Amino acid sequence: MAKAIFITATGTDIGKTYVSGLIAKHMKDKGLNIGYYKAALSGSLDITDSDAWYVKQQADLLDSYDEMVSYTYKHAYSPHLAAQIEGNPPDIKVIKNAYENINKKHDYMIVEGSGGIICPIRYDNNQKIFLEDIIKELNIPSLIIADAGLGTINSAVLTIEYMRSKNLKVNGVILNRFEMANEMHDDNKKMIEEMTGVKIIGIVIDGILKLDEKNIETLFE
């Protein structure tokens, strides 16, 4: 089985897919066999305009789109609502089986979530699935993507503490849109670490991922 990490974020449009692509490319460039999987994806009229396709192109991944994504919805809503409207609800068994199949082909796996950590994937009378259920079913640790700017202390600490309350392992945080010599960004980094005990294992500056190389291996454990 591949070593895997679940990538979530402090909210929508924080840069989760963007950073997933940077991590995948970073590892691919190092000669590591990296794969990508996303259980449910919404707001995609065409696969070439999807999160998974972006990561696939960024890191030159060879897996097919169907291997990388189990459920794709056209409506740009939370997956649970898009699934209700389009009549194709996710099933946790299908998700686990699809993940295990692509997992076998790689040494490392990135599993990307949808939106923030409290995101309903399915919510109906038959089954209720949240991101935390997928993480537990796949039994993998998580990485949180957060914005470097104003308000991130609150959103990052709340995300970490919520995940801890659900007994989910958090292996680190990456700050996106970080600016050097920005005292607020520097302080945000320090405060998140001090308030939670979770390390900021990387930052993204002008589209460049700054990642401590010694963290890349432990990130997936």
UniProtKB/Swiss-Prot annotation:
Cellular compartment(s): Cytoplasm
Main location: cytoplasm
Keywords, ordered alphabetically: ATP-binding, Biotin biosynthesis, Cytoplasm, Ligase, Magnesium, Metal-binding, Nucleotide-binding
Pathway per the UniProt entry: Cofactor biosynthesis; biotin biosynthesis; biotin from 7,8-diaminononanoate: step 1/2
UniProt cross-references to SUPFAM superfamilies, sorted A to Z: P-loop containing nucleoside triphosphate hydrolases
GO BP term, pick one: biotin biosynthetic process
Cofactor(s) listed in the protein's UniProt record: Mg(2+)
EC code(s) of this entry: 6.3.3.3
Signal peptide limits: none
Binding positions (ATP): 13-18, 51, 112-115, 176-177
Molecular function as annotated in GO: ATP binding; dethiobiotin synthase activity; magnesium ion binding
Catalysed reaction equations from the record: (7R,8S)-7,8-diammoniononanoate + CO2 + ATP = (4R,5S)-dethiobiotin + ADP + phosphate + 3 H(+)
Binding site residues for substrate: 42
Active-site residues from the entry: 38
Cytoplasm among keywords: yes
InterPro entries registered for this protein in UniProt: DTB_synth_BioD (IPR004472), P-loop_NTPase (IPR027417)
Record has Metal-binding as a keyword: yes
GO cellular component: cytosol
Residues that coordinate or bind Mg(2+): 17, 51, 112
Subunit structure: Homodimer.
PANTHER family: ATP-DEPENDENT DETHIOBIOTIN SYNTHETASE BIOD 2 (PTHR43210:SF2), DETHIOBIOTIN SYNTHETASE (PTHR43210)
Family label: Belongs to the dethiobiotin synthetase family.
NCBIfam families cross-referenced by the UniProt entry: bioD
General function of this protein: Catalyzes a mechanistically unusual reaction, the ATP-dependent insertion of CO2 between the N7 and N8 nitrogen atoms of 7,8-diaminopelargonic acid (DAPA, also called 7,8-diammoniononanoate) to form a ureido ring.
Protein name from the UniProt record: ATP-dependent dethiobiotin synthetase BioD
Gene: bioD
